[in-house]
Amino acid sequence: MTTFLQRDDFAVTARVLGALFYYSPESHETAPLVQALLNDDWQAQWPLDAEALAPVAVMFKTHSEESLPQAWQRLFIGPYALPSPPWGSVWLDRESVLFGDSTLALRQWMRENGIQFEMQQNEPEDHFGSLLLLAAWLAENGRHHECEQLLAWHLFPWSSRFLDVFIDHAGHPFYQALGQLARLTLAQWQAQLIIPVAVKPLFR
């Protein structure tokens, strides 16, 4: 039986979403993706219902006084407190810290499965964008069992809450649309997941 993880569109959508959450919109990784989302062609290639995507596509193209790089800086870098921090341990750790117990559990799981994933800097591996990029890499390399575990154990337990807060506080139509696109896409993945999603308490 072919699972959704084995379809090409899973790896593509995971990589697109991961890059847009992880890299600056001006970077060579994401600049072409940003331009693609400002056109209508992408909707036909995204594995979701066209009716659900239509309002998202409109929002991507909505004008904002704040530039996209400024919005990305505010949402993902600082210097002020991030409205919806993109690291799992901030949501899963009682103290809402980086490099919390959930990050250590992810590292242990990666070691046990022989997974090496280079981060840009000395930052936690449980960044929402980097986990999506890792899921894409696992799917592309035929490691579908590990990909399912990554989603069920290390991403889905906190991603819905993160995306809800991210959308509410994005403050920029492009990133609000990106959050909605991610929420719709991940909900579809979770509905098709074979193994159960781990139930973990959230502290934000």
UniProtKB/Swiss-Prot annotation:
Pfam families this protein is in? Answer: Nitrate_red_del
InterPro entries found in the cross-reference section: DmsD-type, DmsD_chaperone, DMSO/NO3_reduct_chaperone, TorD-like_sf, TorD/DmsD_chaperones
Q: Does the keyword Ubl conjugation apply?
A: no
Q: Give the superkingdom in one word.
A: Bacteria
The family database entries (SUPFAM superfamilies) matched by this protein are listed as: TorD-like
Concerning HAMAP family, the annotation shows: DmsD_chaperone (MF_00940)
Q: Would you tell me the protein name for this molecule?
A: Tat proofreading chaperone DmsD
Supply the source organism for this entry. Salmonella paratyphi A (strain ATCC 9150 / SARB42)
What is the phylogenetic placement of the source species in the record? Answer: Bacteria, Pseudomonadati, Pseudomonadota, Gammaproteobacteria, Enterobacterales
